[in-house]
């Protein structure tokens, strides 16, 4: 394999640039040319592809977002769209592709593999919802962004003796909410993967207030419901002054943490190794600090789960 491509797809995550950098530098180290596909699968179809050199990825390891940009692409879901994308790759002599993104990006890589084009997926999403890896690129940075927000909100919550509901990202996965809630000392954590008892949450807040607690923090993953609605109900049923903060897209931005830069570098380089070994239809990950790879179809068919022992611990520590 003498030429490979790399693209970023779906929601951006801090560390994607570090992964792109690793792909380019690892490939060039092995005398393999690298082409960047801009705007994800949309760029594959439109032919927005250019050769990347060492200088192309200079000064990006510390930058958030993605140098290659990203976009949604409904056309790629069609056979015609995929065939057009593959034709553009073959026109340039590109023989394999590294896809950095979440489960939707993995689905695209799977489809390309089914068309006979070798792909390797690299998990890039702040949601940490890709099976087969302990952590995804961007999760640690997003987590630290949320923790920073919790700490600052706690200061004002204490000053005004208020309850705060903080809504974080996670439509289908509660990892950000769970980890941030545990690290931030939240009184309650609501995630899509676990049932919750609103009456118990209300009772716990009342008990805390009765014993002199000056503030409370509740973390809600967006997939559970609206933080605003939770805030209204809490204030109505507890008579405690309650405010809501929806963190939104700030969780996706910012300079990647050291952990995300290292993770992205390791996974990006490993993806190139797999392609050069002729292994397509795979995706990479990290488990127990060791690099691993899996069949991408198996990963797509595996349901993501949160660590139940951590969820239980969060309940035990929030009494």
From Swiss-Prot:
The active site is at residue 127. Substrate binds at residues 125-127, 162, 169-171, 222, 243, 249-252. It comes from the Bacteria. The keyword Kinase applies. Keywords: Allosteric enzyme, ATP-binding, Cytoplasm, Glycolysis, Kinase, Magnesium, Metal-binding, Nucleotide-binding, Transferase. CDD domains: Bacterial_PFK. ATP binds at residues 11, 72-73, 102-105. It catalyses: beta-D-fructose 6-phosphate + ATP = beta-D-fructose 1,6-bisphosphate + ADP + H(+). GO terms for cellular component: 6-phosphofructokinase complex. Allosterically activated by ADP and other diphosphonucleosides, and allosterically inhibited by phosphoenolpyruvate. ADP binds at residues 21-25, 154, 185-187, 211, 213-215. Homotetramer. Component of a possible RNA degradosome complex composed of rny, rnjA, rnjB, pnp, pfkA and eno (although rnjA and rnjB's presence is unclear). Specifically interacts with RNase Y (rny, PubMed:21803996) and enolase (eno, PubMed:22198292). Interacts with BrxC. Catalyzes the phosphorylation of D-fructose 6-phosphate to fructose 1,6-bisphosphate by ATP, the first committing step of glycolysis. Belongs to the phosphofructokinase type A (PFKA) family. ATP-dependent PFK group I subfamily. Prokaryotic clade 'B1' sub-subfamily. PANTHER family: ATP-DEPENDENT 6-PHOSPHOFRUCTOKINASE, PHOSPHOFRUCTOKINASE. This is ATP-dependent 6-phosphofructokinase. The lineage of its organism: Bacteria, Bacillati, Bacillota, Bacilli, Bacillales.
